Amino acid sequence: MLDVNFFDELRIGLATADDIRQWSHGEVKKPETINYRTLKPEKDGLFCEKIFGPQRDWECYCGKYKRVRFKGIICERCGVEVTRSKVRRERMGHIELAASVTHIWYFKGVPSRLGYLLDLAPKDLEKIIYFASYVVTSVDAEARHRDLATIENEILAEKRQSENSRDSEIEKRAGKLEADLAELEAEGAKADVRRKVKEGGEREMRQIRDRAQREIDRLDEVLDTFRKLEPKQLVTDELLYRELRDRFGEYFTGGMGAEAIKALVQNMDLDAEAESLRETIRTGKGQRKIRALKRLKVVAAFLNTSNSPLGMVLDCVPVIPPDLRPMVQLDGGRFATSDLNDLYRRVINRNNRLKRLIDLGAPEIIVNNEKRMLQEAVDALFDNGRRGRPVTGPGNRPLKSLSDMLKGKQGRFRQNLLGKRVDYSGRSVIVVGPKLKLHQCGLPKQMALELFKPFVMKRLVDLNHAQNIKSAKRMVERQRPVVWDVLEEVIGEHPVLLNRAPTLHRLGIQAFEPQLVEGKAIQIHPLVCTAFNADFDGDQMAVHVPLSAEAQAEARILMLSSNNILKPADGKPVTMPTQDMIIGLYHLTHRTPGERGEGRAFSSDAEARMAFDNGELHLQAPVKIRLRGLVGVESGPGAEPWTAPEGWVEGDPITVETTLGRVLFNETLPPGYRFVNYEIRKGQLSAIVNDLAERFPKVALAATLDGLKEAGFHWATWSGVTIGMEDVLAPPRKREILGRYEKEADRIDKQYQRGLMTAEERRGELIEIWTKATNEVAKEMDTALPQENPLWKMINSGARGNLLQLRQIAAIRGLVANPKGEIIPRPIKASYREGLSVLEYFISTHGARKGLADTALRTADSGYLTRRLVDVSQDVIIREEDCGTDRAIPMQVGQQAGEAGSLVVHEHAETSVHARTLADDIKGPDGTVVAERGADINSILVDKIVAAGVESVRVRSVLTCESKLGVCGACYGRSLPTGKTVDVGEAVGIIAAQSIGEPGTQLTMRTFHTGGVAGEDITQGLPRVQEIFEARIPKGKAPIADTPGRVRIEDGERSRKIIVVPDDGSDEIAYDKISKRVRLLANDGDHVEVGERLTVGTIDPHELLRILGPRAVQVHLTQEVQEVYRSQGVLIHDKHIEIIIRQMLKRVTVIDSGSTEFLPGVLVDRALFESENRRLVSEGGEPAAGRPVLMGITKASLATDSWLSAASFQETTRVLTDAAIHARSDSLIGLKENVIIGKLIPAGTGISKYRNVRVEPTEEAKAKVYSMTGYPETDYGFGPASGQAVPLDDFDFGSYR
């Protein structure tokens, strides 16, 4: 069997009949499967043991040889080899076909490869293959030319003979007619009878004439056809073809069906064909040139590879191993079988019948019909339903063919190769574990015992609790008390992986140290819920056990939850106290004047706590406390900065005006952090955790988070926050406010009834009035709510809910939308607290229902987007530390603020310029170097740069990276999830795809309607992101100026025309058919620059690429994607979007091939294109000319160099067809390819750089090893606890088969 680690690339090609026979272990001759009485396979049938191997290990069919000692013997009685039964998964058979058939993929695929090769239309090809028409395969033109005169004379003689016989016959008949008429006259017959006889005679003479004429015409047609006979010519008339064959059989050959196609392919001279096509491309125009290009691709594919085009016509069909198309007995004695067996059976039946008919010498028409049926049977086996109606099984279900086995989500690629099930795993419901540390999880005892069973068994034997593995297994199954102690020992320091589906980003799988718990539910630390997007309303999670030492080390170092605090999308902490913890910390740090003990002073925090315990001091009372070990005091955002008293040094005792609660809060923060002396809400807490993440090690951060969690839960209980009906306070002046606006609305209605305004204007006015009313009522509610109101506390602290929700509950529901998404101009005046009227309730249900439908659609769409993004970026891996490029991109660091124009940090600096590498030294106004080239940009450096008055800097970017494969570390910059320089081997492409796809479900699906005809609808949310990444031409696209010039606008009846008169005096450029509704951005007489938008709308990225080049498109696309995400408040770093855009712009269309091998019009990888051109220029050749192309992510994924990756993505059959013809080789660079064939992925620790590490002992270590005194006692390490792995065969796991 092949070992995956021994090959570096995987090639796919066309198999010839010899290849198929070579793979085969025997010919399948009978359609039988298994004998219904003995249940043993029939000889020569589809399950034959002689061909495919024995059904039982080491046992032949007849039972003569049993046991392993006869290994390799072939039984002389039944012919079965004595071997393992698993060979039935590997050994193939074949069916020798009585007539050739074509492979449906190459004839029916789009484009038809056979059609392109033979230059035949697919319609004609179908007629030939399915025996509806004859085709001429070859013509001996020389012989025809030589003998044409003789042949023509022969035909002429035949025609004359035919004319003579016609004339003589007519003469004879005319004589007979005259005699008959004379006889009748003599008999005195009536005129009527005479007339009838005369007419009859004339009719017969006419028939003779016609028959003779037809004969002459046919001779003319035969001669004419023969003169013009060409190879590949179709002859649809069967009689004509037979006549041709009978008369001129030695001058041409022809036929129908796959045999004829085979003959045509054999007669082809590929080199000559390629040369003539190249000539056509050089000289041709229009459609001819395009067709020649397409044909040349196919012809060149066969020329440049070892593939023979004869592989597209099959003489024998391979039969896949029987264990891959099993047949199993059901309870009722019936059998369930794979559809493939039915399809193979049809092929064998028809093939055998055809053989018999040929042997009997049946008429051609019967044989041809059987051949057609055989062709259809093979088609159905390869790709059922591709042509005509699919073959159906019982219950009219189409049978699953070989192609269907590969295609789609349930196909081989996605179901079994990319999505395997694994052992050592389990799943259960999750509950909260508030007492756990950040890196721990609670694992139910029963589950842990099952998962760690082999480890427990080995340890029981090591500790002599059991004599052997078998008795250890029995002990575990009976759950003896000692087993639990051993389990406790085994799971210590052994991390497990927890995963919650859907795993939208890498934080969906994290490692934890298991703690044994009673019950059957897994316990989860409350802070990791955000990362998993988990809640405890019945969610389930899966547990996986990393087995090997390497896997455990990776889980502990890379995946432990306390090492995954930062989110890969933006580098912000994701383990953040939420909900009740925030309420607790808010309660703890809130300051309430007038509380018990206000104004007192305490000599230490311990004294203050004592006063609190004795009930003399309130947690929130403002007091003075003398604190030790402070490094400074933080007064909070918006407050006066704290100034230290004179002479105070860090660490000296100091009296601070604060509250006891704040002192307790600061105890959870690490020593060395400034004293936090302000109220903590969600935003402030987030800023503190951010700051801690940047300045303190992970260990300190994890401990702090645990402290915050403990404090949060504890004080949330103390705060006693509850909600009752009376806490929902309605605004006192609501009636009065609504009454006032009601009058306004009546006034508008009256004006409308008098005809003073249109319905559209009335609608707009009403919406405006009621929006104002809603806002005023909401404002009134805000002012009326007391600070102590629990709802206000929840919202103000950021724990849960927002003012909009409170407004709907307590004040007024407001305006809602109808099912079309337009706003209804009458508001719902009630709040939920008061209750809605029937009509109000009815119109408010539209929005709710639409919301639910939206969410369902959005989830599917978002998942599909992620899948496409992963596919396009999966091979972007950090391959080297620095590619050494000088190219960089400029980025804004600062922006002008206010009237004075002082420079402040740019609002989007965190998601654009942070975590990147500087490309140049940055100098201040006085010429001093503020930051050196190659420095990592963080918030401290950004502040320094902005303080030096620098507004924009040049930074390295993946868009300008020059690495041959993947990208380099310097261009990528800092790794966001670790906060350190990115490691070689990091799969940054997949991280980028996950970061963009994961928030996809939060984006809206809506295209916003303001109702009526208020301009074009703008696509937003998820559909807009898809539109950008698929590089589609946007809806309502705006034209952009091709050249700088003056604008002239011409109004037509229905549309406008914008004309740009270029500055350089070249021809005017017109943009016509611009709707009158669209707002213009350039007026008559304005001057526009190149690439400037002329109307309101979205720019077409392809136009932008053509006019302004790749750099402009990159900036435009990044901004467009960011706009959508920012509008929803989602932060994603630019670098993730840039990686996807880099993949979209990876290819070049060849315009002129120069002296390269590239064909014009083909898409080529940019790196390959540039290196090939450099090589040619250095050798003095002519380089190729190309144009950059922007490809959508689906197209880019399918155009990838790896055929395995493309085939497992979409359009499997098309990708495989194409790859086979080009004999594509997959060099296994990306991740998917390696997962498919079962190798370690070339990313992370699987990259070759780390796989080939050699450990050299130091001199010191060598000295220790070689002197026996280095050992405390001589132990050769063969004892029971030597740490050696016990071979798995020794464990009796029961059968897994």
UniProtKB/Swiss-Prot annotation:
Amino-acid positions noted as binding Zn(2+) 1 in the UniProt annotation, renumbered to this chain: 60, 62, 75, 78
Catalytic activity as recorded in UniProt: RNA(n) + a ribonucleoside 5'-triphosphate = RNA(n+1) + diphosphate
EC number from the UniProt entry: 2.7.7.6
Entry's cofactor comment: Binds 1 Mg(2+) ion per subunit. Binds 2 Zn(2+) ions per subunit.
GO terms assigned for molecular function: DNA binding; DNA-directed RNA polymerase activity; magnesium ion binding; zinc ion binding
Disulfide-bond pairs as recorded: none
GO CC annotations on file: DNA-directed RNA polymerase complex
Biological processes, Gene Ontology terms: DNA-templated transcription
Cofactor(s) required for function per UniProt: Mg(2+); Zn(2+)
Assembly information from the UniProt record: The RNAP catalytic core consists of 2 alpha, 1 beta, 1 beta' and 1 omega subunit. When a sigma factor is associated with the core the holoenzyme is formed, which can initiate transcription.
Protein family (similarity comment): Belongs to the RNA polymerase beta' chain family.
Protein's name according to its UniProt entry: DNA-directed RNA polymerase subunit beta'
